[in-house]
Amino acid sequence: MGNKIGSEYRTVQYPLIRYAEEVGWARVLTSEALLLRKGEGGLLFNRVLEEKLIELNPGLITADNVDEVIRRIEAVRNTIEGNAEILGWLRGEQSIYDESEKRERNVTVVDFATPDHNVFHVTDEWQYTNGQETNRADVMFLINGLPV
């Protein structure tokens, strides 16, 4: 079994990560990714997402409300409907109330118009547990701290 895992890493995972690096994704070592996620129960690179939300949504998202936006993203259920909701966040279709304008405004999570404004990370051996079940992805891609 050890050969199979070693072979999979050598023939699939490593080449995929290497290619991602070649096209501009920054590699994050597994141990560093675990710290950025705040442990195996974390789904996001919290600090990265926090910084990008504030940067991409000037005046709408601030240090005062960024945690609430992240809580909303983290609260999305792991279902087909939840996947659609996360896609809505990625596409900028989810909104929050803008007190200064007295209206809902869409939140930008990914800047599609200017890709250089985004942060692209790739990591491997992403193990996640919710306390009852554990799941592991060989390779994980994140844009602005959010797994895609």
Annotated model-derived regions:
Residues 1-148:
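An alpha-helical interface "stripe"
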